[in-house]
Amino acid sequence: MFAFFQSHLRPIVFWTACVLLTFFCLTRFGDVSAQLPGPILISREDSTRAIAYDSVTHQREPFTATAPIKFGSDPATRIMVFAMNLTLQRDEAITAVTADAEDANHNVLSLTVEHVGTVPDQPWATSIVLRLDEQLGDVGDVLVRIKYQGAISNRVRVGIGHVGGGLADDEGAVPTPGREISIAPPPPKATNLTATDVQTLIAQAASAATSLGHPVTIIITDREANVLGFFPMSGSPATSTVRSVGTLGRGLEGASVMAFQAATAKAVTAAFFSTHGNAFSTRTAGFIIQEHFPPGISFRPGGPLYGVQFSSLGCGDINRVNGKLGLSGDPGGLPIYKNGEPAGGIGIEGDGLYTVDRDPTDNDQPFEELIAASALRGFEAPAQIRADNILVDGIRLPYSNVVNPPAPPTIPFGSLVGAFLIFPPAGPPDSQFTPAVVGGISGEVSTRFFPFIAGTAPAGNTLTAAEVNTIISHAAQQANITRAAIRQPLGSNARVTMAVVDSEGVVLGVFRQQDAPIFGYDVAVQKARTAAFFSSATAGARLRAAGFGSYVDRALADGLRLDGSVAFTDRANGFLHRPFFPDGIENTAAGPFSTPISEWSPFNDGLQLDIIKTNLVSVITPPFGPLFTCTSIPGLANGIQIFPGSVPLYKNGVLVGAIGISGDGVDQDDLIGAAGANGFSPAPAIRSDQVFVRGVRLPFLKFPRSPNL
């Protein structure tokens, strides 16, 4: 169950055939000649040295007993080894597998088995994570074996402290080979774009804009929202006006924003939404955030990512990005791919209007999208993974209305008047993410939120660091076998970010699977905080104290006290945030946390925007204040999120936090969150699906059909 054996971490070269060789164990370990064939630990082709990796850093031996990167609640190193002839039965615990190691002095130390799982695409191979005994010093080679159902494996060599020395191989021991497993290290940088690439993209965009007669602002970002190139063409508008539908002057409708902020939001959105398995544009984003899905079709529920535009905000404390505005649904942002690899995004702003496409049927081709498409010649997304090859609920997503982008002669970059390039002089920025393995699943963490920590509440009413690790591990293991909704090729597993917070919204741990879309990093925390906040005993009081008592009163009118008596998931909370209640049903009143449909717009959706509006405006208008909280409400520093993918967590009947999931289909997010929450779920009697509002049962969770691969 290791995701690094899949997707973009290929070229992982796994053996294609294994030669099962007869071997014998020493008599001192018991006669196993009458046993059925036991597990076989896999070694190199030329020796009995194990195929083994540090499960966090992916480094090869020699290993230290104390981990170079601390994992969980203890400093011990975890290593991965691999076996054949080992498959746990359904519902069989990993305790069925044991392991030990013998050093040169014949000291035999038990090794804790922490994970046993099938290697994806190699059902005959099993990965095993072992925690080294901290008593192991610089002992050199030890002989490691495992036991399962009375059967004892061969012993393989593992170097501790240094390689060499140790006991001689067991009598009759031979290599149990396969072709070398080579785990490719993750890209050390946030992009593979060079300064020349950025110059080419800007020159192609500026040339297209010149040929169309529309000067624009051009922004190039890497995958993690670092701005690599900024070029405001002479004569391009300096500002844009936020305008969609609804009442002018309400929410952000009518607000003036800087053109470079709008362009950056577009580039960031395209970069954050795109991976090796899907390429989404800002047109895609605008399609999935409106009051109906598809937009304009009555009596359809809201978009699956309704509310995502208010994430990755410049005022937040999680994913602090240069865009400030959050995510964009305004056409003109496209992902950049280099040699088929996701590398960043381009954003074009120049029409003076920051909006969303309210009519996806008119096949409009705004010049901003034309220019972005022209700029990407040579940097296009692979056709197979574009949004228009991905269906959600049977609905094909849009990508770009530009079929044949303009291709005028390119003006040399050096001849572009006023060009301003901010490509970092030291080269591409380092990634904020570090490789890590949690629950046997390969992914990435930020050192800001790793190692995982315990909750901040008094002892006994909080999550321990070990429990946080268990929750995230269970979620990651479920994600690794969950059929993805938005990835190509079909049959890929979901790739998500998992976040756990305590009851006060303090982040206890965040884990991102390899190639999970980066927008989910901020959103997962938002979802977790939202579930913890609205399930708390003080939610109503804190909202009222912050000046949002009108929403509390509307909830009370619907029988919702916001006093901790109901365990709210984000699916339930989002249901209450829709401009129609029930969701999508025309001619009904708005949910208690939404604005009325007569005033509603994607830039004025109710409580979600209102609690962040003051601080958001302060970072998008001069002097662009450097805030690190979006609200005045404790526990909601990066705002709230209102589409599914979170579960509140309880321990001994007490709210101790929440888990948030983001990165794939919302039903998949719910399923993965439920797996993480297993053992910490709310009592059935207080779940949101036991509550009726206006005669309508609130939802709790919704799982996809046949979810597992």
Name each model feature, range by range.
Residues 35-186, 195, 211, 465, ...:
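A sequence-level detector for low-complexity, Ser/Thr- and acidic-rich stretches
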Residues 15-26:
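Bacterial N-terminal signal peptides
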